[in-house]
Structure formats: structure tokens, C-alpha cells
């Protein structure tokens, strides 16, 4: 059963869901669920973890008072993994030069990378 609460297209396949931090350059740090599908990257923001609690409404879609960030796969230009002993991150760079960082803390980013690269 799919974990993502965001409505998926009929032909869209969920590849995985993980609870992560999500950092939007100059837009904040959020804690929530990252879902990777074969068509999109969907981030359900449960909590604004940044000092600046202003949400950039241009990126987010609201469904039933819940905030979702949706990035179509075709907008992603590059996927850049960064691994250190205490911090594992993936930077997604879009075709409009926005950077979105998936911060998975000390946990392995390999399953997320596999889903993103498939």
C-alpha cells in the first residue's frame, strides 16, 4: 500500500517514501515525508524546522491544509549525493537553477538515490 497521501496519477508508481529533512535554498528547512514516484518528487512538509518560518508559497501546493512540494522529474537537471560520516545529503538541481537538499542525517541515502535515479 502506498504511503504517500498526495493524490497520484492513475499510471504513476510510488518508488518509496522516507521521513527526511528538506532544505530549500533561501526558503527554509522542513521535516516531513519525501516520496519519489516515477513521475515526480513529492515532499509533505509536516514541520518547518527553520529559524525563518516563512513558507515560499510558490513551491508548495496545499491539500486539506497540508503543505506539499511537488517537483516534476523532467525539471531535475542533476542529482548530487554527498556522504560524510555524520551527514548524508542529496542535492536536486532543477532546470531553473533552484537547489533542493534532502538531508537524511546519519542514515544511508542509497535507497533514496536508487529511487531518484530509476
What are these regions (language model features)?
Residues 25-26, 84-86:
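Short glycine/serine/proline-enriched coil/turn segments at secondary-structure junctions
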Residues 41, 66-84:
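Phosphoinositide-dependent membrane-docking surfaces
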Residues 57-59:
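Short, compositionally biased
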Residues 1-53, 62-63, 68-69, 100, ...:
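Anionic N-terminal interaction surfaces
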Residues 96-111:
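Canonical phosphoinositide-binding patch of PH/PH-like domains
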Residues 89-96:
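Short, acidic/hydrophobic/Gly-rich beta-strand patch recurrent on exposed beta strands
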Residues 50-53, 87-89, 108-112:
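A short local loop/turn or secondary-structure capping micro-motif enriched for an aromatic residue
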Amino acid at each position: 500500500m502506498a504511503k504517500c497521501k498526495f493524490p497520484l496519477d492513475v499510471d504513476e508508481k510510488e518508488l518509496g517514501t522516507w521521513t527526511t529533512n528538506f532544505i530549500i535554498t533561501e526558503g527554509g528547512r522542513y521535516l516531513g515525508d519525501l516520496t519519489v514516484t516515477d513521475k515526480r518528487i513529492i515532499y509533505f512538509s509536516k514541520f518547518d524546522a527553520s529559524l525563518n518560518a516563512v513558507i515560499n508559497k510558490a513551491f508548495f501546493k496545499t491539500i486539506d491544509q497540508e503543505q506539499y512540494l511537488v517537483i516534476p522529474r523532467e525539471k531535475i537537471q542533476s542529482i548530487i549525493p554527498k556522504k560524510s560520516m555524520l551527514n548524508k545529503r542529496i542535492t536536486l538541481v532543477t532546470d531553473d537553477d533552484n537547489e533542493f537538499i534532502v538531508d537524511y542525517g546519519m542514515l544511508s541515502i542509497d535507497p533514496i538515490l536508487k529511487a531518484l535515479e530509476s
